[in-house]
């Protein structure tokens, strides 16, 4: 049996270290598939319990991988006619008919040179039974949205979908910690050759607090984000921390995100790259680009 490594994290507000609340984190498994070299996004399956989807970073194959809680690959799906220019995040959600789908964000732009970025959507694929080889399959033609920012090129590593409204969001990444949340427009019909223009919702600043006694990691750059399935929380990852906001009913996203978030610090995790919620809207799952790639579960009292 694979050992479960217990580590601990601290939960603090963004303004104080007092009232520290310990929480438990488990390194559930390491991914065994050597083809997953830089896990850059993670999404909870909406069809299969205990299954997550991930993908490689820029320049990798345009493929998504289904992984289970033993670290085994249960599917490898190549997105038809897709290109991995800089895939940075993925999420799960429903299409207009209520069918479970995977959304992949080719949204990275370190050099700020892309006129538009892409978001792909496919129906969530089948997976192989446990213990059977996961042969590569090719998806049907994906839905592809080409999107641009209203204020010029931006770099981003966070793709998230609000579970109640179905609206797709992108949270940008900044070396200075000055991120911004954008949403897709209400009308998703595109004219040929013209990208959709994203709508800016609010700015979010990550201050980059240092972790005492730890190797310095820049904590200002946002590397992943997700909405909770119940729509009541939003979590954003930096290289070494997680920040979680409560989203009260009756408040806009901009109003809720203007408040100080709770800060979670997963110990022994290097280069935190992706985060998603479990089905209970409280458990958090994270991966890292560090090899071997860990799958870590964070639970709170």
PLM region descriptions:
Residues 1-4, 42:
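Positively charged n-region of N-terminal signal peptides that target proteins for export
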Residues 3-12:
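Sec-dependent N-terminal signal peptides
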Residues 17-301:
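Sequence/structural signature of beta-propeller domains
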């Amino acid at each position: 049996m694979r050992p479960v490594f217990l580590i601990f994290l601290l939960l603090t507000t963004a303004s104080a270290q007092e009232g520290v609340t310990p929480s438990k984190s488990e390194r559930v498994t390491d991914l065994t598939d050597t083809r997953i070299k830089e896990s850059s996004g993670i999404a909870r399956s909406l069809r299969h319990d205990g299954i997550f989807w991930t993908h490689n970073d820029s320049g990798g194959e345009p493929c998504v991988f289904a992984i289970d809680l033993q670290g085994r690959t249960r599917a490898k799906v190549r997105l038809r006619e897709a290109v991995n220019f800089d895939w940075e995040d993925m999420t799960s959600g429903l299409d207009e008919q209520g069918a479970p789908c995977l959304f992949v964000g080719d949204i990275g732009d370190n050099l700020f040179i892309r006129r538009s970025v892409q978001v792909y959507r496919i129906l969530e694929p089948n997976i192989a039974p446990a213990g059977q080889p996961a042969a590569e399959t090719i998806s049907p033609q994906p839905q592809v949205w080409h999107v641009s920012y209203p204020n010029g090129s931006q770099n981003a590593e966070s793709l998230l979908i609000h579970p109640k409204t179905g609206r797709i969001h992108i949270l940008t990444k900044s070396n200075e910690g000055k991120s911004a949340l954008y949403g897709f427009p209400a009308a998703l019909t595109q004219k040929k050759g013209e990208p959709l223009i994203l709508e800016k919702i609010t700015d979010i600043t990550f201050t980059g607090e240092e972790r005492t006694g730890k190797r310095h990691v820049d904590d200002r750059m946002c590397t992943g984000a997700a909405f909770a399935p119940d729509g009541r929380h939003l979590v954003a990852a930096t290289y070494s921390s997680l920040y979680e906001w409560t989203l009260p009913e009756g408040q806009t996203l901009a109003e809720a995100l203007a408040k100080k978030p709770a800060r979670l610090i997963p110990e022994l995790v290097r280069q935190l790259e992706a985060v998603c919620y479990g089905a209970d809207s409280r458990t958090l799952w994270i991966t890292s680009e560090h090899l071997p790639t860990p799958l870590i579960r964070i639970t709170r009292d």
